[in-house]
């Protein structure tokens, strides 16, 4: 895994020191071990995890500078993209949010085993965390949901002037068109869409960069069922 990560980070133009390498190795070992008894990821094996989880997540740092920023990862699952971002950029102040308690406990175990600090692991739903409203420089998400839904879940967490980075597949133009009304109503502007190929693979992903230009109206986010039923 070391050589894959060294080559991948070099291809992305990102630094990678020995501490980060050790942390990635520890993260992989825990992920591999726990995936045998709980549903954490469908991606297995050193090569695929290194490329499709670790490098894919770290590639966000080539899209938007996050050094010294407060970042919330919404619907983080097994910690992607948040934990690889934190390992690659340790001065990020990170909050990991997930609705499943056993995943949140796993994330806490990873932080303890890797020695990561300034990481908060929260067991809650995004629409049920009003105390976090407007508290972050950036929100990130690789969750599998339509962009308009992710925007309603994530943009309320972002301070005005901050950014929401939504990780998507190679072609998200139609999904972005579908979300533009929601982005505007939630106080955002779709600034640009960045694309990258994961080093060592032919997999191309997109990141929709949404700038928070105004406060999100207090009535958002709505309950999940209403979000799905009544498209913004």
Regions found by a protein language model. Name each.
Residues 75:
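Conserved glycine-centered beta->alpha loop in an early N-terminal alpha/beta scaffold
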């Amino acid at each position: 895994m070391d050589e894959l990560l060294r080559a991948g980070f070099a291809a992305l133009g990102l630094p990678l020191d020995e501490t980060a390498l050790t942390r990635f190795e520890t993260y992989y070992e825990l992920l591999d071990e726990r995936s045998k008894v709980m549903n954490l990821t469908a991606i297995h094996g050193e090569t695929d995890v290194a490329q499709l989880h670790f490098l894919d997540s770290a590639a966000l740092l080539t899209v938007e500078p996050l050094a010294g920023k407060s970042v919330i990862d919404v619907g983080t699952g097994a910690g992607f993209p948040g934990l690889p971002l934190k390992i690659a950029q340790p001065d990020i102040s990170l909050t990991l949010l997930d609705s499943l308690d056993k995943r949140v406990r796993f994330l806490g175990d990873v932080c303890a085993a890797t020695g990561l600090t300034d990481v908060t692991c929260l067991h809650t739903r995004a629409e049920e965390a009003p105390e976090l409203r407007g508290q972050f420089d950036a929100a990130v998400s690789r969750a599998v949901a339509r962009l308009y839904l992710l925007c309603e879940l994530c943009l309320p967490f972002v301070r005005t002037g901050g950014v929401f980075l939504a990780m998507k597949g190679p072609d998200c133009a139609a999904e972005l068109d579908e979300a533009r009304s929601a982005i505007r109503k939630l106080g955002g502007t779709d600034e640009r869409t960045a694309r990258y190929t994961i080093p060592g693979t032919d997999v191309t992903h997109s990141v929709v960069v949404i700038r928070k230009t105004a406060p999100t109206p207090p009535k958002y986010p709505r309950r999940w069922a209403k979000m799905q039923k009544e498209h913004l």
